[in-house]
């Protein structure tokens, strides 16, 4: 059961009811609080594009509590974060794992944060293949290309050498917020909104 709270605002023209996500969007806040699939990605991408069209000079705040999910859906979000003119500040909370950690690290330079008790997990892309040997070989080559591309991006965003990223993502690698900061996945640990930029 998915209950979405409603917020009532009083204005000079009367009352207005918003679902909580629409109200947060007014403050340029986007929540990624689930596994990443095409539907979630389409929603996040739409919100990024809307906020950028509204004011490309004001930062967007993407809060992430996600176990990860689809690589192609996550890459759609990643590409849109880079496509929009507005800086996207990322804030990790709870667990940012797999594609969730990738998106956390993809925030604007100097504007990637985690709350003190957030956990961040990086690993290599997961994929499954079945069918004839040739089909399995094609799928394996494809996942290796994706792994190389994602490791290259992570190396650029963290400042870690590619070889270190490749080694450290070989298996599930869990980090505290402080370890993620030391590694370069985030820029700072914040305890309240005053730690955000802008």
From Swiss-Prot:
SUPFAM superfamilies in the record: ClpP/crotonase
Any GO molecular function: serine-type endopeptidase activity
- Compartment(s): Cytoplasm
EC number, as in UniProt:
3.4.21.92
Question: Which Gene3D superfamilies does UniProt cross-reference here?
Answer: 2-enoyl-CoA Hydratase, Chain A, domain 1
Annotated NCBIfam families: clpP, PRK00277.1, PRK12553.1
- UniProt protein name: ATP-dependent Clp protease proteolytic subunit
Q: Which organism is it from?
A: Listeria monocytogenes serovar 1/2a (strain ATCC BAA-679 / EGD-e)
């Amino acid at each position: 059961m998915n209950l979405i709270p409603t917020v009532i605002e009083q204005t000079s023209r009367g009352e207005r009811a918003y679902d909580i996500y629409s109200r947060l969007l007014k403050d340029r806040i986007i929540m990624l609080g689930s596994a990443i699939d095409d539907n979630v990605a389409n929603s996040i991408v739409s919100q990024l594009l809307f906020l950028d069209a509204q004011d490309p000079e004001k930062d967007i705040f993407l809060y992430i509590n996600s176990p990860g999910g689809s690589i192609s859906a996550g890459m759609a979000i990643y590409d849109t974060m880079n496509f929009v003119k507005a800086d996207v500040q990322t804030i990790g909370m709870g667990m940012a794992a797999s594609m969730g950690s990738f998106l956390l690290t993809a925030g604007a330079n100097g504007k990637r944060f985690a709350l003190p008790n957030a956990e961040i997990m990086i690993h290599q892309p997961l994929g499954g293949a079945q069918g004839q040997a040739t089909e399995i070989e094609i799928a394996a080559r494809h996942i290796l290309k994706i792994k190389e591309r994602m490791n290259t991006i992570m190396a650029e965003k963290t400042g870690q050498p590619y070889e270190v990223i490749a080694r450290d993502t070989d298996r599930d690698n869990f980090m505290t917020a402080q370890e993620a900061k030391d590694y370069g996945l985030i820029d700072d640990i914040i305890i309240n909104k005053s730690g955000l930029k802008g």
